[in-house]
Amino acid sequence: MKAVETRILELRAELDEHNYRYHVLDEPSIPDVEYDRLFHELKALEAENPHLVTPDSPTQRVGSAALSAFTQVRHEMPMLSLGNAFEENDMLEFDRRVTEGLDLPAGDLFGAGSKVQYSCEPKLDGLAVSLLYRDGALVRGATRGDGTTGEDISVNVRTVRNIPLKLKGKGWPDVLEVRGEVFMSKAGFERLNASQLEIGGKTFANPRNAAAGSLRQLDSKITANRPLEFCCYGLGQTSAEIADTHIGVLETLKKWGMPVSHELKLANGVEECLDYYRDIGERRLTLSYEIDGVVFKVNNLAAQRELGFRAREPRWAIAHKFPAMEELTELLDVEFQVGRTGAVTPVARLKPVKVAGVMVANATLHNMDEVARLGLMIGDTVIIRRAGDVIPQVVQVVAERRPENARAVQVPQTCPVCGSHVERTQLIKRSKGKETVTEGAVYRCVGRLACGAQLKQAIIHYVSRRAMDIEGLGDKTIEQLVDEKLIGSPADLYKLKYEQIIDLEGFAEISSNKLLKAIADSRQPTLARFIYALGIPDVGEETAKVLARSLASLDRVKQALPEVLTYLPDVGLEVAYEIHSFFEDEHNRNVIDALLGECGLQLQDQGELGAEFAASTTLEGLIDKLHIPSVGPGAAQKLADRFGTLEAIISADWLDMRQTLPEKQAKSVRDFFDDSAHAERARAIEAQLKDFGMHWRSEKKTVEGLPLAGQTWVLTGSLERMSRDVAKEKLESLGAKVSGSVSAKTHTVVAGPGAGSKLTKANELGLTVLDEDALLKRLTELGVAVD
């Protein structure tokens, strides 16, 4: 028994240390799989020895029985709110009051010169909580409530992964109350809403609501499954002082295992506070969590005590708020716009309101499912949210303010642009050889390029920088060309005459000739650029590159069956069907034929089948992709090893099949191929793969055909002989992965003039660094043209 108890204590200590390194220091020392192994070992030992389970064990974060209600908790030291600053003048006034309150006339010394030192940290947009530790163990968690009385949420805070159940180290007071914010990261919020949608559950308007709703669950098992995090920002009651400054307090708490903001900083005077505010304001949208301002506190704790409090807020702290990202306004109407693929999308027309410093009159509604989820009606009062460059969106309806004359939102039966019929899309779910059809969220105009809106967006996409890269064709010019009926498809761009262009608004002789040259220069695109330019639904730039690299010819891409396309990396069955359907469409084929025929486009980089694709096409892979009920990858491998060919599997007798697989799986295979449609489909897939030059091998091969396969390259600084996009394409054609960040896994860094921190890090890690000349030489050696 002693050995078991010792092992349990060892595991707890080790897991606590790893939790500390992961959540507080952000320096994980072991992979997740090893952490999971240790965790499950501890969990198993505690299950066998329940009398050894303690409340501070890492296993005790999974939640307990649901409560009927939260009990009330009185805060020994009130959790007060902070005063707010909205303008720089408010901060200057705050600093003046602090200086006068400390009786510090100009020229007197305090810390550094006559300036007051302030701690600076982001104001997290979450839920304030109090954590009470006795003898280093967490004994209670409570919400802020009204500042005097909160709710006991102890069982819930114990499930938050980065809240220590027992403090690290030693020297902590007998009684220690830590205060901070429970919040949800942006990524965690997106994951939560996605999972809620999948199960038909409630979604949340923003991360703050999600954090608050998750933390105040009566069933702590629900809280345990929510991606909550904690960041401490100060102390409540303590039985002993732990530092002389606020930053000293936080640094000490960090040593004891408490997560502290990575953005914590000391400012020497109010001007440095304003610099901090501006800096973090510029970086606000790049942070992994949402903040609604910055909190400044007098750093010296003795000075804090001297300044004291007024009403319900401290005189020594202030929250400098950012402009609001959410506002209330009225929904005046819902109009519908038509996109490149014909999607008819609702757009909210709003009573203009200022959100995050910008006047907003329109907001996206995504689709009619979103309108239904919100319960939105014209005339409603709604909450609008805007974050940086993100299009403003309606996140919530204030139902209690709905007027009596509110109207339902109706989808138009005909396209608002061209008058064509509008139909609701269908979603086809394919699994285990069966198809399930459900209504989609998107409504679509069937007018295709006869619809002016679709034509304009299709041309804008076709000429864009990452597609055909035709300079001089801006959105307004394309609108003119379409409105004047000078173009009716991408192919018509190549038929434009000088006389037609010079008559357009904004064009003269030089600009007209430059545009004609840019159009002519686009006649030799790479296969990847051309595929992307076609605007195939769900096919972005990276998928287009995969198609080009793997199949290496437009004919193969056009002919490829959906199941064949799923052999490609990151191409799932639904996307494969979108690609296949696009090339099956007669209208799309006519446009492509015109581009490659009368327009004279010549696609580059076509040739032999890609080595990566060739290595992935195995017989067991084909069997697995047929989605035979009860037959997974393991059974598929057994069939491939036993029979060697598809025809042998189809024609195998019962005895052979039964010797290979258990009865249930054997029967499933026989039943599947007894359906002639299934057998013929499998033969068609195999025939196409063989037409592409494949032959079966029972084992998956390592890709060796591409000289830079498995290598990660990074481009930094500027290049003179070619753009970074072109350099990236050429490296990727050789099998390299081109990343935006340098790490120990990086193989080579290409550094041009202006290279900064990435080059510094590469040198620190001892990585191979090439200049542009060395890159061009390397590409030439590998047979890639660089001119």
From Swiss-Prot:
Gene from which the chain derives: ligA
Family: Belongs to the NAD-dependent DNA ligase family. LigA subfamily.
Name of the protein: DNA ligase
Record EC number: 6.5.1.2
Record-level GO cellular component terms: cytosol
Keyword Transmembrane helix: no
One GO molecular-function entry: DNA binding
Domain BRCT stretches: 703-787
GO biological process, one term: DNA replication
SUPFAM superfamilies: BRCT domain, DNA ligase/mRNA capping enzyme, catalytic domain, Nucleic acid-binding proteins, RuvA domain 2-like
Reactions catalysed according to its record: NAD(+) + (deoxyribonucleotide)n-3'-hydroxyl + 5'-phospho-(deoxyribonucleotide)m = (deoxyribonucleotide)n+m + AMP + beta-nicotinamide D-nucleotide
InterPro entries noted in UniProt: BRCT_dom, BRCT_dom_sf, DisA/LigA_HHH, DNA_ligase, DNA_ligase_AS, DNA_ligase_CS, DNAligase_adenylation, DNAligase_N
Role noted for this protein: DNA ligase that catalyzes the formation of phosphodiester linkages between 5'-phosphoryl and 3'-hydroxyl groups in double-stranded DNA using NAD as a coenzyme and as the energy source for the reaction. It is essential for DNA replication and repair of damaged DNA.
